[in-house]
């Protein structure tokens, strides 16, 4: 049998020691950690950002050079001579105006850009001015505008120039008689036997009774087309003298002149007319 004292010692060794775990269960922040939290406050972070922004602004900021009147005159005179000076010319000019050669080079770059802008604006202004000059002005329409319509010529008068471009002088001979573009010297003038009525731009012929004159003369032949008044676009038309009124009435239904020559054969004379 075992001793009860041994059993008590075994049970005491098996039971865990909770005092060793008490230090892990209780959490207390250390002084160093609390100081780190205090350093990372929002106010300090914003101030650090402002400092960084100031440093960046100083890096991006360029030093602008102020030129005196003497320096500007010397630079402009050199620019008038050449827009692209070489290194030796820039160094000589920089020593003259007491500026670094880099500043002189930058000034020439800016001056060339300004010159190109001015040249482009001048070209655009000239183009607009030329367009205004070439465009027609419509002011005369407003000045000459009237409420009353223009007066039309009467129907019984004929304008000086017809629609086909032939003037009144074309239908007149040297004696002032109206003909149809060819001489009637050997056949007689139709103005003696006919009556021409002008309505607008169309001619109508009203033949009178010319039985006696037509019987005395034979049927005329077509005249030669060598007359300067006859053109290939307006073929001649020679009206034959028609003694009967029936033919003349039928002839009056068509406007004159015809686009092609029309020939009418005279009617056969009866024995009663021949005996007369």
Curated annotation (Swiss-Prot):
What PROSITE patterns does the database record attribute to this sequence? HOMEOBOX_1, HOMEOBOX_2
Single GO term (MF)? RNA polymerase II transcription regulatory region sequence-specific DNA binding
Q: Which UniProt keywords apply?
A: Developmental protein, DNA-binding, Homeobox, Nucleus
Q: Name one GO biological process term.
A: pattern specification process
Bias class Low complexity marks the residues at 28-46
Q: Which GO terms describe its cellular component?
A: nucleus
Q: Where is the composition biased (Basic and acidic residues)?
A: 209-219
Q: Where is this region: Disordered?
A: 28-62, 209-230
Q: Which domain of life is it from?
A: Eukaryota
| Cell location | Nucleus
Per the record, DNA-binding region residues lie at 60-119
Q: Which PANTHER family match?
A: HOMEOBOX PROTEIN, PUTATIVE-RELATED
Q: What is this protein called?
A: Homeobox protein ceh-8
Q: Where is the composition biased (Polar residues)?
A: 220-229
According to its UniProt entry, the function of this protein is described as: Required for cell specification of the RIA interneurons.
